[in-house]
Curated annotation (Swiss-Prot):
Probable splicing factor involved in constitutive and/or alternative splicing events. May bridge the 5' and 3' components of the spliceosome. GO terms for biological process: mRNA processing; regulation of RNA splicing; response to high light intensity; RNA splicing. GO terms for cellular component: nuclear speck; spliceosomal complex. The keyword Nucleotidyltransferase does not apply. Induction: Up-regulated early after high-light irradiation, but not by paraquat or high salt. It comes from the Eukaryota. One of its GO terms (molecular function) is RNA binding. It comes from Arabidopsis thaliana (Mouse-ear cress). Component of the spliceosome. Homodimer. Interacts with PRP38, SCL28, SR45, RNU1 and U2AF35B. This is Serine/arginine-rich splicing factor SR45a. The splicing patterns of the pre-mRNA are similar throughout the developmental period, but change in response to various types of stress treatment.
């Protein structure tokens, strides 16, 4: 085989191994030998595939060029600069002056079905094609100067199956008639407006300026200061089907307040003030029917229907509505003077009726005492 020799260098004092073989004249290190032995002259599977693909491409490239030349024998013409209104019939008539036309292929836009400005024309012979190039190049067709040259292909490529999305813009979107940024903005605006109207804020014109300020309605002022109950009014029960704040979830969250934000927002709007005034002046049977058509679920949750709270607060119970309908006669002006309401709260009406009855009793007692005195004085006088 070979001999192993160890040489000591005096300068660096490093050990150097030299492998000598009778068949090889080169001295190689163990690392290079291992690399050499690891990678055999035979190619790896990756190199095999790579070499096979390279050989295929090299072997097929001349046949491809030959096939392309065979595909266009020389009678196919490439025409550019066409008008968008030109048709295949116009092209055929224009090139029929110089020879016989066998095929016309006009490339159209898939959306508008108009000409994209170029096409392919096949003549019967190569002589006719050369004649068309000499005479019709830079000619005028429908007001446009066209260019005629020899085509690389017989006709245009077959369009890729799928949907044509148009040209790509800088933002990565495709320009097509189906996409409209103005339309998307309007959709988002309408969604945002509908969402805000569902929440009840768009009903109040002064919501953004005043925020969560106190209510301007005397009805809510009386309810806020005189009513210990937290049950909604008949008007709020009527609107509970349109307002999300009266769902069980929002009722649990807003029990600490006497009324919800939507009620305050609607209370400031003149539209709802007019509706409330009209309803408070006339208690129609239709409104009472709507008021009584509350679901049993909400009626069970509403505290105004429980007997315990009827004893505490009689101002919004069904009995008080009956009392208000039959016994509230006189109109009263609100303390702020901003809105009029002819409905008097039952407690206030009862207090006024009691005070009137007391005054009447006092006046009658005083009249009776005066009449008694006058009678006694008449009887005593001679």
């Amino acid at each position: 085989m070979g001999k192993r020799e160890i040489h000591f260098t005096p300068v660096g004092r490093q050990v150097q191994r030299v492998l000598e073989y009778p068949l090889r004249l080169e001295n190689r290190s163990p690392m290079s030998y291992s690399r050499r032995s690891r990678y055999s002259p035979s190619l790896s599977p990756y190199d095999k595939r790579r070499g096979r693909s390279v050989s295929r491409s090299l072997s097929r490239s001349p046949t491809r060029s030959v096939s392309s030349d065979a595909e266009n024998p020389g009678n196919s013409l490439y025409v550019t600069g066409l008008s968008h209104r030109v048709t295949e019939r116009d092209l055929e008539d224009h090139f029929a002056k110089e020879g016989k036309v066998t095929d016309v292929h006009l490339v159209l836009d898939p959306w508008t079905r108009e000409s994209r400005g170029f096409g392919f024309i096949s003549m019967k012979s190569v002589g006719d094609a050369n004649r068309c190039i000499r005479s019709l190049d830079h000619s005028v067709l429908q007001g446009r100067v066209i260019t005629v040259e020899k085509a690389r292909r017989r006709r245009g490529r077959t369009p890729t199956p799928g949907k044509y999305l148009g040209l790509r813009t800088a933002r990565g979107r495709h320009k097509s008639p189906s996409y409209s940024p103005r339309r998307s903005v309007s959709c988002s605006r309408s969604r945002s407006r509908s969402y805000s109207s569902d929440r009840g804020r768009s009903y109040s014109p002064s919501y953004g300026r005043r925020g969560r300020s106190s209510s301007y309605s005397p009805f809510y002022r009386r309810r806020r200061f005189y009513s210990p109950s937290r049950s909604p009014s008949p008007d709020d029960r009527y609107n509970r089907r349109r307002d999300r704040s009266y769902s069980p979830y929002y009722r649990r969250r807003d029990r600490s307040r006497s009324y919800s934000r939507n009620c305050r927002a609607r209370d400031r709007s003149p539209y709802y003030m007019r509706r409330y005034r009209s309803r408070s002046r006339s208690y129609s049977p239709r409104y009472r029917a709507r008021d009584r058509s509350c679901s049993p679920y909400y009626r069970g949750r509403d505290r105004s229907y429980s007997p315990h709270y009827q004893g505490r607060d009689r101002s919004y119970s069904p009995e008080s509505r009956y009392y208000r309908r039959h016994r509230s006669v006189s109109g009263s002006v609100s303390p702020g003077g901003r809105s009029m309401s002819r409905s008097i709260s039952p407690r206030k009406g009862r207090k006024e009726s009691r005070s009137k009855s007391r005054r009447h009793d006092r006046q009658s007692s005083m009249c009776h005492s005066r009449s008694a005195r006058s009678s006694t004085s008449r009887s005593v006088s001679p």
